[in-house]
Each structure stands twice: as C-alpha cells, then as structure tokens.
Design a protein with these regions (language model features):
Chain B
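C-terminal terminal-subdomain/extension
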Residues: 292-350
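Soluble catalytic domains of membrane acyltransferases
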Residues: 3, 13, 116-300, 304-306, ...
Length: 330, 350
C-alpha cells in the first residue's frame, strides 16, 4: 500500500479528532516514513513522536490561507490530510462554523497556491441527512442534505460543497473525500459513545432506526489507503450490515427510555443546554430515520474490506463501556 | 347464542352461515348493487352485532392466545402490557433491510387467521412463482388499508413449496409514522425507490410492487376493479434493468373490505396521510370502523413475463417502457375481470 514517493511531504491537519490521533500514530509507526507534519492549535498529547514536526497555526485567523500556503511551500508538501472536521457538535456553533467552513476554505486556497497533488478529507455520512425518504443504502452520488437544521451537519455539508467545487476547478489535485459512518471503538469519543455512558438513554417513541457503524481501526485503515493510494472521488467508509438502535442499547445494558418525538426535541435541547445531553435536539433526526450508506464503492475501488461488521464494531464499543463502568465502580 | 361455540368447532368457513353475518352480508350486497337503498341505521345495528360475534369467534379460534404465546407475554398488567408493546418492536436480529424474522413469525398467526378464516383466500397459480432467483410480483392494489400485500405475502409463504419470503415496497409516507414505519420495516417492507428495488433484486429476492400506489387504494367504490395508471413505469424499467421476470397477480375481494365513499384531503393534511377515508363504517364507528369487511378473496398468480435484454439506451426509451407498462396493466386488468366474472358472491364462497 505504500510507495516511497507518496510518503514525502505528508501534512495532517487536525491532531485532536479521533481519526487525526490514530492517523498520526500509524504514520509514526510506519518505517517507510521519515518525517511528517502536523498542523493544529495544540500539539498532540498522546504518546511520544520522533518523526512528527508540529506546526502551530490557527486556521481561523485572518490571512491563515496565505500563511498556510507559505508553510506548505516551505516544507515541500505534496499530500494534505484534512482531519479537522469536528467529531462532536459544539456548544459554540459560531466557532465551529469558523473552523469547519472558513478553515476548510483557507486550506483549499492554500492547497491551490502551494500546488499540492493530493488532498484527503475525513467527512461523515451524516451529510446525507436522516430522512424517511432516503433509500436503505445511500450511494455516494446521492445529493447532500439541502437544509440541515443542525449547525453540526450544516457546516459539514458546507465544507463538502467547497471541496466539490475544488474538485471540478483543479483537476490536477487528486481529492478523496471519505465519508465515515459513526466511528466506534475503545478510543472513540463522540456524541454516540457519550450516549452510552449514561444509564438511561432517551429514544424516540415509535421509532427504531437501523444504525451503521465503522470500527476505528477499520476507519484509520481506510484513511491510510486513501492517503497512500490513488483513489480520487467520494467514498462511503462503513461497516457491513446494520443494527437497530434498541438492540444496541440492550446490548450495552442501557435503559431505553422512549419519549414522544413532540416532547423529545425540546427536552433533549434543554438537556444539551445544561450540558447533560451529548447532542442537541436537532440531531435527534439521526435517531429517528434512516441514514445508512452504501459501502460498495470503497470495497470495489479501494479494495477496502472492514474487519468489523457494524454489529461487531458496536459490540467492541459496548464491551469497553462495560469495562470502564466496572472500573469506575471499583 | 349457543351457536357460537359450535361455530368454531365446525369446519373452516362454515361459521359464515351464522344468521347475523348472513344478514349483514346480504344487506351490504344489496347496497353494492343498489346504492340508493342504503339504510345506515340498519347497517350500523347489524355491524355492531357482527363485531360482537366476531369478538367471540376470535376468542374461540384462539388467535389472541396464539399471538400471546408467540410473544411470550405473561399475565397482562397495565404496565406489563405497555412494556410489552414497547418491546414488541425491538429486534435482536435484523437483516440488511431491517426484516426481523422472529418478530414476523410472532405476528403471523393474526394474518394466518385473516387468510384462512376471515377472507378465506383461495390461491391459484402458485407454481408460477419461481423456487429461487429474483422476480418482481406486480399486483393490483385496493382496499384503503394494504391487506392485499399481507395476503399475497402469506399466500406465497404458506402455499409455495419453497416458502419464499416476499418483500414489498412501501410508500415513503409510512416511514414518517411512529410504530407503523418500524412495523412495516420489520415484516419486510422497504421504502419504494429504484435504489432499494434494484439492490433487492440483485440479491435474488422476491419483491412485490403495487404500481397503482396510493391511487389504487384510494379509488372510490364506484371505480372498483378499474386499474389506475401504473405509476411512471418504474416496475417495467426495473425488470428490464435487472433482467427479472414480472409475475402478474390479480387480487379480487380486497376492493370491498372498506368501500370508499368519499376521501378528504383537507382532513388528511394535518394527519400527514395521503387521504382521509370515509366508508360506511369509518369514521362513524370509531376504531371499530377500521375493521375490514369479511369478503371472500381470490388471488390469481399469472404466468411470468420475461423481457429481452436491452441496451442501457433503450432503458431510457420512455415510449418502450410506457408501452410495456400499459401491456402489463391490461394483463392484470384482464385477469381481474375474469375472476370477477367467475365470482358469484362478494361474501360467500359458494
């Protein structure tokens, strides 16, 4: 999977999302790589890195694009992996918007100016939106959610639109967009895994959507494939199969507390405002309707075969949640 | 009333000889032939008596206890029942499209009852369903509530030697609804869209489509057995694209289960449903009015129609698709008319 040419001038943006963290560790462990660069506000905290060169930069500051372009030229960057799209909804949507949309625009302008050849983005299948009008398996060519209510999803859709524009404007840059399903695993921390840290989980009365997961190991493997291989285009990175939400909660030993949707949206929003819920009410649509993506293209083109199915990935998470609960109780 | 007990002990179908049922059926049949003689009060009184009888018959046949056993529920307390109802739709094992076989089997006794005792469905041509491989079952759609889909599913599952699982494509509005959406999904329904249908056929499943869609189930009683436009030819295009045979199916008897007198779209809009039905019993009798009338059904499964393989350009040929769709519609219409010619009574098998 690795050719020596592609390992030069590798830049990772975002060291504190789950994929950023795991990717940096994998790159550090890869003997073919002599040096790579990481751009973020704060250096990575986990582990010791010898090959890693940290560049401190705020992507949202004015003229960040020019600064980034200069840096990229200076280090002779060839490939940029964009892992700075947030895993979790933010209590400060304004800041999140600055980072995700404006930050992405800055990265894209810098890419063009510094004439990079490859650009990999970690997005999410949430951009398709959850709706009863979705097919059971959404393909990459499906339109993105047109007016998502949640800031979290809207920013991602916005960022993806900018990236799609780059794809058509600059054919010399190979752009791979990876849309990941819910990433779960022992180290993942997102709004869904947070949900399982509570004994009682509110669900929507009368709805039991089919959920799809990808294990973090599989996710980072797909990211490495895209970074070192030549796979331009959009790919859904998802585990095989689906599991119903109610089954997931039972496996994790949680109490399923159904709330009528009419009350649930404001109720969860209030809990979110008080920092009790791990997600705002507007994200509840994702626990109501279908948003399962079709991973066929990644299997065929990238030869990406996830080790864990959706169910196995979830059970791995559930196991870890139980272990943590047990050690808390001790 | 001593007759009730003997009713259940008699052979299947013979309890339809009961006086009230016969009176009710005759009243309805008279009304079907001459709408001006409609006497709502008499019908209402008869209907109430009929529902009382039905309750007893249900008890005798033991459907409810069978279903209860299927769900393994214990003594029904109010809380226990609520909990059960919530857990009813929670699945352990679902396949890629959300079908839960365990749940399906637990509610099957109810549909089996409808199939053998209530609608007394007679099925012909079951051998036209292939033992394996993809096929597209296309049927006429009627009866306000989609009992016809359920009956075709049961017919194929019970009477076909390979006991094939039929999946059906469901209009999107169903998935907006609490409970109904999950229920439909867990018993094998998926949203009707080309992506889903193609994927299912490519994995060699047997799927049912009702190209008349909402227009079919919402046709007025005066238009009964007059097949509506077959959508935009999606079924035929799908058959061409995936090279699957189309099996035409005609259902007779479903039109009269809920005779639709009037449909209101104004009332339907706030409820999020495509139309609000007004039948002789609904909404006048409340939830009781939603009980279908016990008509006698016939399902005829026709010979499979295979299509030659064509180029991708021809698939986009609207005229060809439209012509084939119209041909298919005529085939099913003809089958329906022939069954109607043979039928002597709406309610009785003899």
């Amino acid at each position: 999977m690795s050719t020596s040419l592609k390992t030069e001038g590798l830049v990772v943006v975002g060291a504190h999302t789950i994929l950023g963290e795991l990717l940096i560790e994998k790159l550090e462990a890869n003997p073919d790589i002599e040096k790579f660069w990481v751009i973020d506000l704060h250096p990575p905290t986990r582990g010791k890195f010898k090959k890693l060169q940290f560049i401190k930069m705020n992507l949202t500051q004015p003229a960040a694009d020019a600064l980034l372009a200069e840096k990229l030229k200076e280090i002779g960057a060839k490939t940029l992996v964009h892992c700075a799209l947030k895993n979790n909804p933010s209590h400060n949507p304004g800041d999140a918007h600055e980072l995700e949309v404006i930050g992405t625009i800055n990265i894209l302008s810098a890419l063009k100016a510094a004439q990079l050849t490859k650009f990999v983005v970690c997005s999410t299948t949430m951009v398709y939106g959850a709706s009863p009008k979705n097919p059971n398996y959404i393909s990459e060519s499906a339109p993105l959610a047109s007016h998502p209510e949640s800031h979290f999803v809207r920013d991602k859709v916005d960022a993806e639109k900018q990236i799609a524009a780059l794809q058509s404007d600059e054919p010399t840059i190979k752009v791979s967009v990876l849309r990941f399903a819910l990433i779960v695993g022992p180290r993942s921390e997102n709004y869904f895994t947070e949900l399982l840290r509570r004994p009682i989980v509110p669900t929507l009365l009368g709805y039991d959507p089919l959920l799809q997961f990808i294990h973090e190991e599989d996710a980072v493997y797909a990211l490495l494939l895209a970074t070192f291989g030549d796979y331009a285009g959009v790919f859904n990175i998802v585990g095989k199969g689906v599991i119903p939400l109610s089954y997931a909660l039972r496996e994790a030993g949680k109490i399923n507390f159904p709330v009528a949707p009419f009350f649930a949206y404001p109720f969860i929003q209030v809990l979110w405002n008080f920092n009790i819920s791990s997600m705002p009410g507007k994200l509840l649509d994702y626990f109501r309707y279908l948003w399962v993506a079709d991973g066929e293209k990644a299997r065929e083109v990238m030869k990406f075969n996830p080790k864990y199915s959706s169910k196995e990935a979830f059970l791995d998470l559930a196991k870890n949640v139980r272990i943590q609960e047990f050690s808390w109780a001790q | 009333m001593g007759t009730v007990k003997s009713i259940a002990q008699k052979k299947k179908g013979s309890f339809w000889d009961h006086k009230i049922l016969r009176e009710l059926a005759e009243e309805l049949e008279r009304y079907y032939s001459d709408p001006s003689s409609f006497d709502p009060k008499k019908l209402e009184a008869l209907a109430f008596e009929f529902f009382n009888e039905l309750k007893k018959v249900l008890k005798e046949v033991g459907v409810l206890s069978q279903m209860k056993q299927g769900l393994k529920s214990k003594a029904p307390t109010a809380f226990g029942f609520l909990k059960k109802a919530l857990h009813l739709i929670q699945s352990d094992e679902v396949d890629d499209f959300g079908l839960d076989r365990k749940f399906e089997l637990s509610i099957k006794p109810f549909f089996d009852f409808l199939f053998t005792h209530y609608f007394r469905v007679s099925v012909s041509g079951i051998e036209n369903i292939p033992n394996e491989g993809r096929a597209l079952v296309v049927a006429n759609h009627s009866g306000v509530l989609p009992y016809d889909a359920a009956m075709i599913k049961i017919a194929i599952f019970n009477e076909h030697p390979a006991r094939r699982e039929l999946r059906f494509l469901v209009d999107d509005f169903v998935f907006h609804f609490p409970f109904l959406g999950i229920l439909m999904n867990r018993i094998g329904g998926v949203r009707a869209c080309p992506e889903n249908a193609e994927r299912l056929l490519k994995s060699d499943e047997l799927i049912a489509v009702f190209p008349e869609g909402i227009k079919g189930i919402s046709k007025k009683f005066s238009d009964r057995y007059r097949l509506q436009r077959f959508g935009r030819g999606g079924a035929v295009r799908l058959a061409f694209k995936t090279q699957s045979p189309i099996i035409p199916v005609a259902v007779v008897g479903a039109e009269e289960i809920h005779p639709l007198l009037y449909k209101s779209t104004t009332l339907a809009r706030p409820l999020g449903i495509p139309f609000f039905p007004v039948t002789p019993t609904f909404p006048w009798l409340g939830p009781l009015g939603a009980i279908p009338l016990p008509t006698k059904w016939t399902i005829q499964i026709g010979k499979p129609i295979t299509y030659p393989s064509i180029t991708s350009r021809e698939i986009n040929d609207g005229i060809l698709i439209n012509r084939e769709t119209e041909k298919l519609r005529e085939t099913i219409q003809k089958m329906v008319l022939e069954l109607l010619k043979e039928r002597r009574s709406v309610f009785f098998s003899d």
